[in-house]
């Protein structure tokens, strides 16, 4: 069975209730490929999660942008996986490069978070990616492999994991990895998973691309054999997010 195309929209720390309502209305009215062609998940800030979930069309789903590494308790400011499950939130994004950089989240911490979220019944979009310095030093694959290894060491079942490759140098910069550059990393990452986790997982796990994806470049990126979708930042707040969702048809044509 082929890997179903996956498009995630990461709204990051953006939006007012009026803006959020506008985006949701736009998505609800959009004509996009059916659920059997593309899986669509949007990730608003915590405060808007129930609002978006209640308003959003039934064939789209919501994700939190983070959750705590273990059971809730005396962890001021954190949100636990159990709380998300209680609210009926099916997905969570973990290990985003902004959190790795700004909040010093280590590979091991992201691995622990992923394992705990999965154990509570959440599905995980697990982010990996290299900085510009790491790319220029020729260590892209080793960096991405180390990030993935930290997850593989804690997780045995990959059914509910989507891996998002986001080169840090391409996030919000307007620079985008060329389709060939992105495909190369996706191919190498899938190969690493095959050799270190198993051929079944490598064949079925979706590896999506993030990093300045927009309506103009999404079709060409979607045409690459190892790119199974996108994690979209800035463009997920704009009408062009609909065009990115439509790029899923490249796979089914």
UniProtKB/Swiss-Prot annotation:
List the EC numbers from the record: 5.3.1.1
Pathway, per Swiss-Prot/TrEMBL?
Carbohydrate biosynthesis; gluconeogenesis; Carbohydrate degradation; glycolysis; D-glyceraldehyde 3-phosphate from glycerone phosphate: step 1/1
- Subcellular localization: Cytoplasm
Please list the GO biological process terms of this entry: gluconeogenesis; glyceraldehyde-3-phosphate biosynthetic process; glycerol catabolic process; glycolytic process
Sorted alphabetically, the Gene Ontology cellular component annotations on this record are: cytosol
Catalytic residue positions: 96 (electrophile), 166 (proton acceptor)
**Residues involved in substrate binding:** 10, 12
User: GO MF annotations for this entry?
Assistant: triose-phosphate isomerase activity
Enzyme class, spelled out = isomerase
Which CDD domains does the record associate with it?
TIM
Q: How does it assemble?
A: Homodimer.
Give the family, as the similarity comment puts it: Belongs to the triosephosphate isomerase family.
> NCBIfam families recorded for this chain?
tim (TIGR00419)
PANTHER family listed in its UniProt record? OS01G0841600 PROTEIN, TRIOSEPHOSPHATE ISOMERASE
Q: What is the official name of this protein in its record? A: Triosephosphate isomerase, cytosolic
Q: Which organism is it from?
A: Coptis japonica (Japanese goldthread)
